[in-house]
From Swiss-Prot:
Pfam families: Sema (PF01403). This is Semaphorin-3aa. Residues 1-17 form the signal peptide. It comes from the Eukaryota. It comes from Danio rerio (Zebrafish). Keywords: Developmental protein, Differentiation, Disulfide bond, Glycoprotein, Immunoglobulin domain, Neurogenesis, Secreted, Signal. PROSITE patterns: IG_LIKE, SEMA. Glycans are attached at N53, N126, N593. Transmembrane segments: none annotated. Belongs to the semaphorin family. GO terms for molecular function: chemorepellent activity; neuropilin binding; semaphorin receptor binding. Residues 31-515 form the Sema domain. SUPFAM superfamilies: Immunoglobulin, Plexin repeat, Sema domain.
């Protein structure tokens, strides 16, 4: 019977999301989003903040045998422990010489940004040494790092006795993008070879052979390239056929594109190329290049192109001759910003290099496929016994060399697998910068998990899941993590499958994070299954790391479908089909005609929120219809102008991938506004202090109250202040001893401000009132009494004398005693509100003239 319950739940899970018609499935949204502080607090991030006098931590070399990560930066080389980068940190200072810095400054370069030694080459030379090169303040320099044979040797030092010119190995300009690869003692590098940055070339240096490079100052070969990666890919089982593949972007060739445009390329050359005999001497004779295309097909054949290559990652396969190539692209436009990731197969790349060459008859002609005779052996073919039987490129016929020099480009572009990108991002704040991929073995197959770095210092963890075929992939964003304290572009990434760690570099420093955080997905089987993370599975008690070799039948994982109903047995044997037995009910109160916000936010950002209302004495659950009065936000449900019909139990569901999970059960009770008004009026007329519960009532509902009996907030506050300030013993108002009429103690703004001063200041600044009670007190409307003098109009307050001041003080001290004898006349009602408004306006400097006229005279 369990399977019948499962089918029933599955049908309910499919039917309910259909009723959430206004919403659509959240695509390209990370399921979890972790901030920098959350990563640190959960011990999922280790950071090295770098040195104050160093930056540019973007040259990585993974040394798995010694368990170290080598990082080249400005004037320094670092060695980090792969387990924890903050443990056993080693560093070597390698600054540029003062004379080179001075020359760099005199050449017009920025002393702080350019005239340092930025390490740009870190390549393993042998078992004990690392070949290292830096910009050297626009004077490239190279040397060796001694590491020792084993990690226990604990050796990390720079060979101070060996330095050589780094021209053709390291760029002059630290901002210039370059790549290098060291194979069999020979260094292959793509870089610029002059101070001005105009001579771009692909070099092969070191070793026993003569240095070799691409044709110089020929835009058909290279046109201001920026190199992003160099890799060795075998062509056959014969090592003589091995080829070097380069990934770069350059300006479009003349006639290739209207206007100035950036073209992404893949280039190839033979590892055993020795140059030509009479032509192309010490130049590559097997160099070919082709365009890499990454675009989204559009209507009427108009595609959206991502032109600028940013990074490349080769995912090795069982057959080393056919790795899968992942490439990161961005748009060239400043108006439309987007990023994409495309996959390429070596079969498609080889097919393009075996296709037609690009050709044009003159500068005024279009590029067309070459239709003439192609010489033998085909240009681009490596000299070996497998293809052609030539022992060296120096033995190639002259027509082959001439054709290769005039036709370095292929006509057809390399199309991505599936004809479109596997990941696309547009209309977002960030762009992709770096990429590494890990192939993970899961319960239902292998999956490639991508870790994508952005220019805001965040990392996206994305898995592609095949739907009908491997060419139709579903993109699932598992996590988005902030790995640097400030937004900064991620410029380097390395992945260690042995340590299960990811290492990231930027201008701010180095960060390290694990590849998986299974515990953050939740504490339930359904949450772990819905995550669809190939690294994680439910082991019966928690979401933990999945190991394919573990012989545990309780492991539950479903990456392809993400269906908890088929994996989590507790959902089948639970009598509570809706799952609300485990959800705690919360009671909240609202006032009629006010607003109420019911908070409910799912842990997963991919989940959709679905609300139901169960009214009192009604077992049915009614769907919440979103309208002008009800608004659904990412954090909950906002109800404007509560009514009695809103009372009841609100049920909040999370709908994700066809599965419905209850989140909250909120019991809302709506209080009639008339009832609240009666309570407030009763509290206002009661002479005793209100009960504590009445104060809580007032404080809970004050922000939402819209009672008709209270004309303004000022009147409301006046009532509350009077009730709070009323002393325990009732005092009688002041009485004029001569007339027996009670005089209200009305303070002017000036006396109110004086009451805030210390007693001495209050005595000095007190208004001067005559001691004789029969003296006439001028009303406020008469203003200041003035007398005429020969010198002009003089205010009477300037004619007051010192004895008058003393008498006024004595009169003020005597008034409280006199006031006790008079009758008590309590004052309540609107006059207090009017005075409070006038007091506030006078404090803000308004109606100053009225204030001067209404102030009583200080002396007579």
């Amino acid at each position: 019977m369990d399977y019948l319950v499962g089918i029933f739940l599955l049908l309910c899970g499919v039917a309910l999301p259909g009723r959430v018609a206004p919403q659509h499935t959240k695509e390209n949204v990370p399921r979890l989003k972790l901030s920098y502080n959350e990563m640190l607090e959960s011990s999922n991030l280790v950071t090295f903040t770098g040195l104050a006098n160093s930056s540019g931590y973007d040259t990585f070399l993974m040394d798995g045998e010694r368990g170290r990560l080598l990082v080249g930066a400005e004037d320094h080389v670092f060695s980090f422990d792969l387990v924890n980068i903050n443990r056993d940190v080693k560093q070597i200072a390698w600054p540029a010489t003062p004379s080179k810095r001075d020359e760099c400054k005199w050449a017009g370069k920025d002393l702080r940004k350019d005239c340092s030694n930025f390490v740009r080459v870190l390549q393993s030379y042998n078992q004990t040494h690392i070949y290292i090169c830096g910009t050297g303040a626009f004077h490239p320099i190279c040397s060796f790092l001694e590491m020792g044979k084993r990690a226990e040797d604990n050796i990390f030092r720079l060979d101070a006795n060996y330095f050589e010119n780094g021209r053709g190995k390291s760029p002059y300009d630290p901002k210039m993008q370059s790549s290098s690869l060291l194979l069999d003692g020979e260094l292959y590098s793509g870089t610029s070879a002059d101070f001005m940055g105009r001579d771009f070339a692909i070099f092969r240096t070191l070793g026993s052979h003569h240095p070799i490079r691409t044709e110089q100052h020929d835009s058909r070969w290279l046109n201001e390239p920026r190199f992003l990666g160099i890799h060795l890919i075998p062509e056959s089982d014969n090592p003589e056929d091995d080829k070097i593949f380069l990934f770069f972007k350059e300006n479009a060739m003349d006639g290739e594109h209207t206007g100035k445009a950036t073209i992404s390329r893949i280039g190839q050359l033979c590892k055993n190329d020795m140059g030509g005999h009479r032509s192309l001497v010490n130049k590559w004779t097997t160099f070919l290049k082709a365009k890499l295309t990454c675009s989204v097909p559009g209507l009427n054949g108009i595609d959206t192109h991502f032109d600028e290559l940013q990074d490349v990652f080769l995912m090795s396969a069982k057959d080393p001759k056919n790795p899968v190539i992942y490439a990161v692209f961005t748009t060239s436009s400043n108006i439309f910003r987007g990023s994409a990731i495309c996959m390429y197969s070596m079969a498609d790349i080889r097919r393009v290099f075996l296709g037609p060459y690009a050709h044009r008859d003159g500068p005024n002609y279009q590029w067309v496929p070459f239709q003439g005779r192609v010489p033998y052996p085909r240009p681009g073919t490596c000299p070996s016994k497998t293809f052609g039987g030539f022992d060296s490129t120096k033995d190639l016929p002259d027509d082959v060399i001439t054709f290769a020099r005039l036709h370095p480009a292929m006509y057809n572009p390399v199309q991505p697998m599936g004809g479109k990108p596997i990941v696309v991002r547009t209309n977002v704040e960030y762009q992709f910068t770096q990429l590494v991929v890990d192939r993970v073995e899961a319960e239902d197959g292998q999956y490639d998990v991508m870790f994508i770095g952005t220019d805001l210092g965040t990392v996206l963890k994305v898995v592609t899941i095949p739907r009908e075929s491997w060419h139709d992939l579903e993109e699932v964003v598992l996590e988005e993590m902030t790995v640097f304290r400030e937004p900064t572009p991620i410029t380097a990434m390395e992945l260690s499958t042995k340590q299960q760690q990811l290492y990231l570099g930027s201008d701010l420093g180095i960060s390290q994070m694990p590849l998986h955080r299974c515990e953050v997905y939740g504490k339930a089987c359904a949450e772990c299954c819905l995550a669809r993370d190939p690294y994680c599975a439910w082991d019966g008690t928690e979401c933990s790391r999945y190991f394919p070799t573990a012989k545990r039948r309780t492991r539950r994982q479903d990456i392809r479908n993400g269906d908890p109903l088929s994996q989590c047995s507790d959902l089948h044997h639970n009598d509570d089909l809706e799952g609300y037995s485990s959800v705690e009910e919360r009671s909240v109160y609202g006032v009629e005609n006010s607003s109420m916000f019911l908070e409910c936010s799912p842990k997963s950002q991919r989940a959709l929120i679905y609300w139901q209302l169960q009214k009192p004495n009604d077992e049915r659950k009614h769907e919440i219809v979103i309208d002008e009065r009800l608004s659904l936000t990412g954090q909950g449900l906002l109800i404007r102008s509560l009514t009695q019909a809103d009372s009841g139990v609100f049920l909040c569901h999370a709908v994700e991938h066809g599965f419905i999970q209850p989140l909250r059960r909120i019991n809302l009770q709506v209080i009639p506004s008339q009832r609240v008004g009666e309570l407030l009026l009763r509290a206002g007329t009661n002479d005793k202090d209100p009960a504590p519960k009445h104060k809580l009532w007032y404080r809970d509902f004050m922000s939402l109250l819209e009672h008709p009996d209270l004309n303004s907030v000022d009147e409301f506050c006046e009532r509350i202040w009077k009730r709070e300030k009323k002393p325990k013993g009732k005092k009688a108002p002041k009485v004029n001893p001569g007339t027996g009429v009670s005089i209200k103690n009305e303070k002017t703004p000036q006396t109110t401000a004086q009451s805030l001063q210390n007693p001495t200041q209050r005595a000095q600044n007190a208004p001067k009132v005559p001691n004789n009670p029969s003296v006439q007190i001028f009303p406020k409307s008469t203003g200041l009494q003035r007398s005429q003098s020969p010198g002009g109009t003089v205010s009477t307050e300037s004619q007051s004398t010192k004895p008058d001041t003393q008498k006024a003080s004595e009169s003020q001290r005597a008034q409280p005693n006199q006031a006790k004898k008079g009758p008590q006349t309590p004052q309540r009602g609107p006059p207090h509100t009017a005075k409070w408004k006038q007091l506030q306006e006078n404090k803000r400097g308004r109606n100053r003239r009225t204030h001067e006229q209404q102030r009583p005279p200080r002396s007579v």
